[in-house]
Amino acid sequence: MSVQFTSEHVCYVNCNYCNTILVVNVPNNCSYNIVTVRCGHCTMVLSMDLAPFHQARTVQDHQVQNRGFQGNNFGSYDIASRNQRTSTAMYPMPTSQQQVSPIRPPEKRQRVPSAYNRFIKEEIQRIKTSNPEISHREAFSAAAKNWAHLPRLHFGLSVADGGGGGGSN
């Protein structure tokens, strides 16, 4: 076993939002009292107080550092400016005392509907208001046919140009 002294110190931080353990490399010459860490799992920003780290660092300077826990098992990090959203403490943990929490998947984010989906939805509503007796399937089919003729207008081409739509001209 070889002793490695690096210019960084490894700390483990628990994200308060998704309960992911983050591995944070803090430079030994870091003069900030508070740094910001972004969780790579849920993108939550955590403000870290380095005062306990600076006190504990002097005790642990003689221990072996960076024992191979820099992989992706603990999420990722991003040390940014002093932007504070959530406050939490950061304590360096010896590698023999680390605790692995179960990692929950991030919540699904609502995506913005595509132009096609918006067009089809609006077109089905338009077709059904003009003809309430039509089935949803028939309205969808008509809307899809309308979309097939529409793209040449979206690309800045006029009907007179005769280009664009992928139909047989």
Curated annotation (Swiss-Prot):
Tissue-specificity statement: Preferentially expressed in flowers. Expressed in leaf blades and leaf sheaths. Does not show polar expression pattern.
Intracellular or extracellular location(s): Nucleus
Zinc finger (C4-type): 15-42
Keywords: Developmental protein, Differentiation, DNA-binding, Flowering, Metal-binding, Nucleus, Zinc, Zinc-finger
Top-rank taxon, per record: Eukaryota
GO biological process, one term: abaxial cell fate specification
SUPFAM superfamilies named in the record: HMG-box
This protein's record includes keyword Metal-binding: yes
Keyword Plastid: no
Gene Ontology CC terms: nucleus
GO molecular function, one term: DNA binding
Record Gene3D superfamilies: High mobility group box domain
Family listed: Belongs to the YABBY family.
Protein's job: May play a role in floral meristem development and maintenance of stamens, rather than in determining polarity in floral organs.
PANTHER family: PROTEIN YABBY 1, PROTEIN YABBY 6-RELATED
More details: YAB1, from cultivar indica Minghui 63, was shown by Dai et al to be involved in regulation of gibberellin (GA) biosynthesis, to bind to the 5'-TCTGTTA-3' GA-responsive element of gibberellin 3-beta-dioxygenase 2 (GA3ox2) promoter and be transiently induced by GA in seedlings. It has to be pointed out that this YAB1 sequence differs from cultivar japonica nipponbare sequence by seven amino acids, of which four are located in the zinc finger domain.
Name the UniProt record assigns to this protein: Protein YABBY 1
Annotated source species: Oryza sativa subsp. japonica
